[in-house]
């Protein structure tokens, strides 16, 4: 039987979603697979909609796995949460999946949110869940810059990590919204798929624009140059959240 689950996790202590050979530390995938084994004594592979990097959080990661069991869905969910209780991972929902469902390849849209605290004083309580940017940001300029990245089939070669293995750097970004709420700024980014570290490079570029390092229209030149060195810094991972996956 194939199961589909929505998962929340704090990425702080993890090396990322995916198991990585030769890398010290624990992955989210490993934690969930270990919990399933403790429940069923079955070795399964858990697949995710988004292979989040080390330090990146999830409010609505979607996963699937195949399991041979007669247990009811709620029993599986509660048991996994019991085994995951010390790992900062929580199964929010779990149900039988339709035949052929794949958490990654069936996804139609992924929604990310990046959280910035924009004030002089550094945060204490959530310092590993947001990016502290002390210098005042112009959110209007950030939004104008973001508008140049929204639309069908743009080449984001300047906005992907050097280690990105995707064959094509062309992506359609459906939404980038920059919203200020008091001292907090939220950057919402939605697309069917993203390049490696694309969202974080977008956010880093928008922050530099918000500081006045370059005008919003300069984003057009960054896209045209198709060179990672042309774009801004890569925002740190701990402000990024995978919020929702649509199917």
Curated annotation (Swiss-Prot):
The active site is at 53 (nucleophile). Keywords: Isomerase, tRNA processing. SUPFAM superfamilies: Pseudouridine synthase (SSF55120). Substrate binds at residue 112. It catalyses: uridine(38/39/40) in tRNA = pseudouridine(38/39/40) in tRNA. Pfam families: PseudoU_synth_1 (PF01416). Gene3D superfamilies: Pseudouridine synthase I, catalytic domain, C-terminal subdomain, Pseudouridine synthase I, catalytic domain, N-terminal subdomain. The keyword tRNA processing applies. Its EC number is 5.4.99.12. NCBIfam families: hisT_truA. PANTHER family: PSEUDOURIDYLATE SYNTHASE (PTHR11142), TRNA PSEUDOURIDINE SYNTHASE-LIKE 1 (PTHR11142:SF0). This is tRNA pseudouridine synthase A. It comes from Anaplasma marginale (strain Florida). The gene is truA.
């Amino acid at each position: 039987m194939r199961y589909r689950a929505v998962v929340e996790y704090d990425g702080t202590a993890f090396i990322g979603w995916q198991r990585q050979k030769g890398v010290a530390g624990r992955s989210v995938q490993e934690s969930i697979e270990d919990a399933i084994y403790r429940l069923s004594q079955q070795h399964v592979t858990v697949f995710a909609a988004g292979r989040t990097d080390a330090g990146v959080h999830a409010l609505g990661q979607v996963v699937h796995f195949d399991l041979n069991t007669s247990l009811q869905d709620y029993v599986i969910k509660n048991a996994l949460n019991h085994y995951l209780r010390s790992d900062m991972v929580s199964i929010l929902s779990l149900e039988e999946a339709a035949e052929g469902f794949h958490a990654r390849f069936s996804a139609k849209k992924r929604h990310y949110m990046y959280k910035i605290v924009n004030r002089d004083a550094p945060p204490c309580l959530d310092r590993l869940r947001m990016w502290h940017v002390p210098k005042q940001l112009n959110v209007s300029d950030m939004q104008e810059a973001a508008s140049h990245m929204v639309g069908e089939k743009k080449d984001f070669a300047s906005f992907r990590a050097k280690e990105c293995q995707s064959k094509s750097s062309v992506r359609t970004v459906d939404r980038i919204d920059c919203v200020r709420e008091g001292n907090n700024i939220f950057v919402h980014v939605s697309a069917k798929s993203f390049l490696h570290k694309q969202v974080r490079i977008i956010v880093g570029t928008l922050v530099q624009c918000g500081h006045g390092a370059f005008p919003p229209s300069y984003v057009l030149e960054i896209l045209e140059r198709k060179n990672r060195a042309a774009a801004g810094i890569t925002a740190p991972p701990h402000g990024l959240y995978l919020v929702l996956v649509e199917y």
